[in-house]
Curated annotation (Swiss-Prot):
This is Probable U3 small nucleolar RNA-associated protein 18. Its main location: nucleus. Involved in nucleolar processing of pre-18S ribosomal RNA. InterPro entries: Utp18 (IPR045161), WD40/YVTN_repeat-like_dom_sf (IPR015943), WD40_repeat_dom_sf (IPR036322), WD40_rpt (IPR001680). Keywords: Nucleus, Repeat, rRNA processing, WD repeat. Disulfide bonds: none annotated. Belongs to the WD repeat UTP18 family. GO terms for biological process: rRNA processing. Component of the ribosomal small subunit (SSU) processome. Pfam families: WD40.
Amino acid sequence: MEKDTEELELENAVFGNINNFSSFLDKENETFDVMMNEAPELSEDNDAQEDELEKLEDAELFMFDTGSADGAKDSVPLDIIAGDNTVKEDEEASNEIPSIWEDSDDERLMISLQDHSRLRKLRQYEDEDMVNGLQYARRLRTQFERVYPVPEWAKKQDVTEEEDEFNALSEKSVIPKSLKSLFKSSVSYINQSSKLLAPGTINIKRLKDANFQAPSHSGIRCMSIHPYFPLLLTCGFDRTLRIYQLDGKVNPLVTSLHLRSSALQTALFHPDGKRVIAAGRRKYMYIWDLESAQVQKVSRMYGQENFQPSMERFHVDPTGKYIALEGRSGHINLLHALTGQFATSFKIEGVLSDVLFTSDGSEMLVLSYGAEVWHFNVEQRSVVRRWQVQDGVSTTHFCLDPSNKYLAIGSKSGIVNIYDLQTSNADAAPKPVTTLDNITFSINSMSFSQDSQVLAIASRGKKDTLRLVHVPSFSVFRNWPTSATPLGRVTCLAFGKGGELCVGNEAGRVGLWKLAHYD
């Protein structure tokens, strides 16, 4: 059966046409013959090279690299094998940018290129073996740049003298010195903790107890934060001063000092951070020099012994110049912090409850048990102001924020009044901006955070009695502490500079929490 026209066309499209293929092959052969005729000299050279290679022995065609230079009679340059990309060491050394730091041992260091198979590619001659450290580093760099060439954007651009002068002139005229000082460092100048803290709930997490590595054998009576470093000082009736490093993970004990003759009531870091002042219910106190490890005993206040039965309660002004001792019958005695010598004394009417200094040390505030506040000028030894706490009775403790704006006064009934000293009239008694009644037991501990946004108030009259107050809104955080928060009977409080909250209790533990807002 003969194939019709449609079937033949389909067969040619799928399998091709043998006649067309033969004619195409003949045309290709003719083209190849023409090219060979046009280049007769090239073909003769190739034939000559093939004849020469056929006459060579197999041993002459190949070279076995054994890694040793003993059997090598002639040193064949390996630059030929590497090609034109090989850079001579002398040229490369001259083109290198001078290093900022150089190691003198690099020139004395000798490295063998024959012992390690991976280093043989760095040789320039077959029998080359030992190179110094500088040559070795230079060849490694060259080998790397062969595989990964330097991109155009990383190459140093040639700057003409005119462009250099123009850039220097524009830099001097546009960028002032103050901006240049900022650009020299990569330190962040934005303080994330300066943002306002939101009221209502607080994000807080518990860390390992601050004194976990070396717990106290008695209740914690007083705590103090180092003015410059994350260090915590604790003291108690076990007669031991302990300093811990607050890292939140281990909190290691840095050092400790045992004073056999005094059950300690108060211990504070001096504002210079180099000394610790401690005292118990005795007529003397100790000044511990942390740098020299020397302990100085201060005693015998001449002329004031009758009004100072003990030195167990004292305060150090922020300038580090004076130590204020709480005495009997409303007396406050000031000592020179460096020498321990008596400086002067102040007196109020009634029973003394608490003493504090303003942040600049210019004024001393004294609280009486009869709900009266006295302002003294320290240098002039005079009364600046005196006012009565509104609806106050049996005031026990007060606290001033670092900005000298808010004054919190606690009472025996648990009421806490907060006053704004900067907006109040100096001639009249200030009015409280808010009154907190969340605690119904005597207030014995209060502390402001470093940015004055959080106020912690506590009482040891009942277990787990502590509240955190959002100062801008004067509201109590409702989510912390919870009924499961292990606080115990709180005896003292302290805020760290990084948002750490230290809580000491009668069981001798110092709980440590971290406010996430200050991370």
